[in-house]
Each structure stands twice: as structure tokens, then as C-alpha cells.
Amino acid sequence: MARTAVIAGVGPGLGESIARKFVDEGCQVGLFARSERYLDELSTDLGENVLAVPTDITDPEQVDEGFEAVREAFGPVDILVNHASGGSWKGLREISPEEFEDAWRVSSFGALCCSQAAVDDMLAENGGTIIFTGATSAVRGRDGALGFSAAKFSNRGMAESMARELGPEGIHVAHVVIDGQIETPRVEQQYPDRDEETFLDPDSVADSYWHLIEQDRSSWTLELDVRPHVEEF
């Protein structure tokens, strides 16, 4: 039986690669993002086992409606990837309270809304997987990125707390630290002379996400760090 996945905050780069990987592995996938045009283009490319659901994940009502649309199309949700992130790249003296709150709402509050919407399906099925997409800033606060760093630290704490709460119920919660820059068309334009080996390949990272989903219950990963082999850490 095909598994049903929701990717919350899909976009060009890693989110798109995760969606493609899940479809290739036989999943039925709900794609959440704000851009209806982008979602329509991506879902058309990926085929009939994909549902585009334009959603603002900071709005609990929209999130609930989005999950209900996925259930009606594909059935209960087995997999959730909390992938959305946001935040202006500003430090303490530049960031406004509104910008700080927006970073938290997109990354952390949105992840809360999506996790709450998915968890009952997983509990009813005695299993499931919830993955948080993190960043270097989740373990080492970045200078000049106060809102982003705070939100990513928050998500890491959420993942650890949820793993302890839900693990005994058969739900695998994992946090992925993306320790490096992901190669995307936009990044390639910004750094045309940069060595490709210094980038993370999004398709390879997506393979690592699928590995987390396939792990046996006797050997679950809580936190996974991924980085290019030349990345200093």
C-alpha cells in the first residue's frame, strides 16, 4: 500500500528533490507552499500521485484544510516533512520584532500546526515519520541572522521533545542539520565560479531523508548531519 506524505514548505532545491524522491519511491505526496503557480508547475511535472495544496502554514485553519484535502485524495498521512523556513538576515540591532516573529511563525509555529494535524493519523496507524529540516544555525547561532537562528534552534528543540513523546508510540521524529549550502539554480547564478564540490547536492540529501523513513525501529536516528566532504566543521 502506498504511503502518504506531506511536504510543508516545498520549493526549488531540496524541497523539490524530496518530493521527487518520495514519488519515485511510490509515495502519494501532498505539497504545501504559498505559491499556487509554483505548486501547479511542480505537481504537473511529478504526475498524478501528487496533490498541490496552496497553504500558508502559519494559518492553522489553512493547515487543517490542507491535510483534509490530502486525506480525501490519498488517505491518512504517514510522513510529514517540516521543511519551511524564513527570516530576514539581520542582527539584534537591525531586526524588527515583526521580522523576528515572522521567522518563528514560518519555521516553528508552522511546524507545530502541521505536526498536530498529522499526528492523529500516525497514532491511529501505530507508526509514521516526522522530519524537521534544520540548518547549521540550529546548533550554532549565526552572526547577523538572529531570527533565522532562533527559529531553527526552536525547531531542533521541538524535534527532540516530540521524539521523546512520540517514539514510544511508534512515530519516528528526526532532525536533519543541513550543514552547508545546497546547490540550486539561484545559488549557481550567485556563485558561478564556485567549486561544485563545496555544495550539497539536493538529490543526495533527499536520499538521506528517505533513509530515515526506511529505518527499522530498532535503530532510529534522532539527528542527522549532512555536509559536503570539503565543508569545515
How would you name each of these model-derived features?
Residues 131-154, 160, 164-167:
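Catalytic loop of short-chain dehydrogenase/reductase
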